[in-house]
């Protein structure tokens, strides 16, 4: 991966949850259509990267959690036709694991970051997922970032031990000195022993929000008739991204217990902590799902939601509802520092993208965790006393866990590519969200 320093220009938005169309070419036949390319990442290589990401650590193969592949295909983002003068193709591996044990979206170009998105649960249908407003915006930014990585002309990372092009020189290891057990690399004509380590870390609480809900059936049970039948919504209006985002944040604290005279039964609500638990054959709703649907409708009414196929609220009304619910928070233009500090304090974040403040035409969802990979390289002289020659700390991957709350893709970890997020003119975060009595 190139040493691209990223600014996390948030990728969350809200208001009317309008969908930006993002087209992909049909899945390709890997054997017949993949051109011979020195940068091409094979399926086996992509699978290894996927397993590392899903294991939550990249330090040793022993720590990798094994999953069985259910299916795999490649797709090419159609916008790649305008990518570069060299005709860079934006190609990804989509790897799904059996028993809904997760998926990974892995780059097929070795010049880029290996894993762009992954989840420990569920599977990814790329065409359905990009109908999700938030994930579609993410894929738009990911495509731009992918192209930028292939065009990067800055300094290369030093060749690492597992790089087949590494000019490793044979040595005779001396068991009594652990440095001599390290692999060797050659840089600028000098040979060094290299100690390379990757450390994965995230906010102390891990995922902050204990629920995974959606805008469709059964959570939209009380949202009124849609007038037509929809595969995702049933015959009901959508919950709305604003009410859903706020509702999921409330679940962290199980507070308040009522709004506008509507009482929330948190014991029942928390029984419906996952979309799969609540959704049974598109018809039968659990008691927990009904309690959740009741709460989400009450929140939407307080926001003056405009119910329909794309239920909408304003940013002003969303902020006012949080105040009505006796919550403390801050709301400002996007700041990476504020985002990370909020998550490190175990306070969830709602990120909003919009074209005009208080107007319809945006989107919102929740970010409830961050994960990063720090990479450390220590180079030792290849001669006695084998002291440290120099050290490098390489900026690695940064991921954010997003509760999309829409379509079949409810949540996933996504690469920080938001320097390239241009779907909206403005980006705002609501952060440090907690009840007033919480301090």
Report residues per predicted region.
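Bacterial Sec-dependent N-terminal signal peptides
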Residues: 5, 11-37
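Short Lys/Arg-enriched alpha/beta "domain-start" segment
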Residues: 35-66
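Exposed beta-strand-loop-beta-strand "reactive/processing" segments of non-cytosolic proteins
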Residues: 62-110
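Active-site-adjacent substructure of cysteine-protease-like catalytic cores
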Residues: 81-101, 328-396
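Structural recognition of the beta-strand scaffold that forms the well-ordered cores
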Residues: 94-95, 105, 240-251, 295-298, ...
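Catalytic Cys-His active-site segments of thiol-dependent hydrolases/isopeptidases
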Residues: 107-108, 113-123, 369, 373-415
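Active-site-adjacent structural segments surrounding the nucleophilic cysteine of cysteine proteases
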Residues: 121-308
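Low-complexity, Gly/Ser/Thr/Pro-rich intrinsically disordered linker/tail segments
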Residues: 398, 417-439
